[in-house]
A protein has these predicted regions:
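Membrane-interfacial amphipathic/re-entrant helices at transmembrane-helix boundaries
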Residues: 1-27, 56, 67-71, 98-101, ...
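Helix-loop-helix "hairpin" substructures at the membrane interface of multi-pass membrane proteins
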Residues: 21, 143-221, 245-251
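Hydrophobic core segments of alpha-helical transmembrane domains in multi-pass membrane transport
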Residues: 54, 58, 76-82, 109-117, ...
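Single transmembrane alpha-helix segments in multi-pass membrane proteins
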Residues: 10-61, 89-96, 101, 237-245
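Cytosolic-side transmembrane-helix boundaries in multi-pass membrane proteins
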Residues: 10, 89, 120, 181-188, ...
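Alpha-helical transmembrane segments within multi-pass membrane transporters and channels
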Residues: 65-109, 116, 250-255, 285-286
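Transmembrane alpha-helical segments in multi-pass inner-membrane proteins
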Residues: 25, 29, 65-77, 198-208, ...
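Transmembrane helix-bundle core of multi-pass membrane transporters
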Residues: 93-94, 98-169, 196, 220, ...
Length: 294
């Protein structure tokens, strides 16, 4: 059976690959949207935090024999703690000045992190094994679905929806949003706004690390893995609407699928389709699909 002249196995395979890539786009753009939407920082170090998260998982397994499931917890905590240190020592000094300084600082941090990890691990990729529980594939009849890729999609959707619900539908999320818009009022209720801001950045860094751990068995762990992805992720955030949590999730998943299907029908355009869509969206709706017009 063919779909538009393409064998269904090839079509569904690329669709699944697009959904997996979209899951990574969604998780990374989610962390960016959380940090920008709540703190107003354009975090160019996000790709580096993603890369560090993958390397933490690799080192835990290679040096200490700590498996994937523990790395899913430990790596986000380690990178989240690193994010807390970055926020307290560097970023907190920039909140009241032009946002361009935050962008330049985080861009510099990304270059430093990439250089350090290239020195420690070289540019050659490190392989990370798929955990035993998720090895193999399931035959669905019309396609063979790798179990690990199905897990990536499920885990990413769960984390994304959980984060969106926490920020948009809980009291904690209400405090976070209010703290960025009117810190003095929230402080009057006895809430420590600087600590809340610090933990928000740490949580965004942890989300990037979690995406890195999920990606490690799919792609090789390399110092360049973050810089190769971050431009696309920024495009996702811009298309979805800067600071829009739901917009980042839906746009990330949607663009991953579009990119995957483009590889089927017009492979030459697959590397630029996201940026073409971004240009079209910005011409029609400068605030993004889900962003608020100012």
């Amino acid at each position: 059976m063919d779909i538009f002249g393409i064998p269904i196995q090839a079509f569904m395979g690329q669709l699944m690959l697009g959904l997996v890539n979209g899951s990574f786009y969604a998780m990374l753009s989610l962390g960016l949207a959380v940090i920008f939407g709540l703190l107003g920082i354009v975090n160019f170090a996000h790709g580096a935090l993603y890369m560090i998260g993958a390397y933490v998982a690799f080192v835990l397994l290679d040096k200490f024999g700590i498996n994937y499931w523990f790395a899913l917890v430990i790596s986000p905590l380690v990178v989240g703690a690193l994010g807390v240190v970055i926020e307290r020592t560097l970023l907190k000094r920039l909140y009241k000045i032009d946002p361009i300084y935050g962008l330049l600082l985080t861009f510099g941090l990304a270059l430093i992190a990439e250089g350090v990890f290239r020195y420690w691990f070289d540019v050659s990729g490190q392989s990370y094994p798929v955990p035993d529980l998720l090895q193999g594939a399931t035959n669905l009849g019309f396609m063979v679905l790798p179990n690990y890729r199905a897990w990536v999609v499920f885990a990413s959707l769960t984390v994304c929806l959980g984060t969106w619900y926490t920020i948009e539908r809980t009291r904690l999320g209400a405090y976070l949003r209010a703290g960025t818009e009117n810190p003095a009022l929230v402080q009057a209720f006895g809430i420590n706004v600087p600590v809340m801001v610090m933990l928000t950045y740490g949580a965004g860094a942890g989300l990037a690390a979690l995406a890195g751990v999920l990606a490690a068995p799919v792609i090789q762990v390399t110092p360049l893995m973050g810089s190769n992805l971050i431009i696309v992720v920024f495009a996702v955030v811009v298309i979805g609407g800067m600071g829009s949590i739901l917009g980042s999730i839906l746009t990330g998943l949607g663009l991953g699928i579009v990119e995957g299907l483009t590889k089927v029908f017009y492979p030459e355009a697959s590397s630029i389709v996201v940026f073409v869509i971004m240009a079209i969206v910005l011409m029609i709706r400068p605030a993004g699909l889900f962003g608020k017009e100012k």
